UniProtKB/Swiss-Prot annotation:
It is found in: Secreted, Cell wall; Membrane. LRR repeats lie at residues 69-93, 94-117, 118-141, 142-166, 167-192, 194-215, 217-237, 238-260, 261-285, 287-308. Belongs to the polygalacturonase-inhibiting protein family. Keywords: Cell wall, Disulfide bond, Glycoprotein, Leucine-rich repeat, Membrane, Repeat, Secreted, Signal. InterPro entries: Leu-rich_rpt, LRR_dom_sf, LRR_N_plant-typ, PGIP. Its main location: secreted. Glycans are attached at residues 106, 120, 130, 291. The keyword Membrane applies. One of its GO terms (cellular component) is extracellular region. PANTHER family: POLYGALACTURONASE INHIBITOR 1, POLYGALACTURONASE INHIBITOR 1-RELATED. SUPFAM superfamilies: L domain-like. This is Polygalacturonase inhibitor 2. It is a peripheral membrane protein.
Amino acid sequence: MDKTMTLFLLLSTLLLTTSLAKDLCHKDDKTTLLKIKKSLNNPYHLASWDPKTDCCSWYCLECGDATVNHRVTSLIIQDGEISGQIPPEVGDLPYLTSLIFRKLTNLTGHIQPTIAKLKNLTFLRLSWTNLTGPVPEFLSQLKNLEYIDLSFNDLSGSIPSSLSSLRKLEYLELSRNKLTGPIPESFGTFSGKVPSLFLSHNQLSGTIPKSLGNPDFYRIDLSRNKLQGDASILFGAKKTTWIVDISRNMFQFDLSKVKLAKTLNNLDMNHNGITGSIPAEWSKAYFQLLNVSYNRLCGRIPKGEYIQRFDSYSFFHNKCLCGAPLPSCK
């Protein structure tokens, strides 16, 4: 009798555990995910999304723990043969903290406005697709955003100044689009943290705002635009900047007066209209990358352990720079 009872209890526990395991997925999330799959034309990439199975076991997503009732917290669709537009149903996954559509060259249309409903979102990556239209203003409504990557798309129009109001933002990547207009003045007064800022390979124009000299950017890349003005405001001895890339613009300033942060590791300012000479203090800088070519610099290249690592490519096509690795000064 005891053995029978023990066996009964074990079987009951097993059945209960199996039942609970099957029911981890919230029914509303499963319904929404199946609508997303249908909206994307039922791609093979989402073959695991079988309505007969627990959605928390499906590929391309993650569920949270019991504290959020195992709701879907991450949707990660990338590297697949998927066509269409971002399904509006993504906005019906209220517990999402991470949303990624990446390396989907047949994904088209505008950035889905229903994303504005995702108030818990901290990580947004919509990159390497064929998305068009503007960088949406509604992103500034998502107050928990820490990471935004909209690079390698066909986005156009101006950069919304309201993005600077995101107090938790640490990373803003808008490179490789068709964005136009100036850098917003408000980017000199981010409400919270100062994010790493990547705006390269666009069609941005106008004078760089003076306010951009106020933040202590850890990484800033403004390369390959049509920007003008005095970019020396980005530098400063008291800053903690690591990477600055302002190459292939139309910046004009006197390099002789520029003081570098001791932390600066990568500096690229090739193809501008920069004048003056390379400061002697640069001989002590710890550069891993340096390029000042195609400017209007003159004078002797300072001698130093790290600056001497670079070949002529980093210095050539200037007005009258001289000294190793270029020809000797006369």
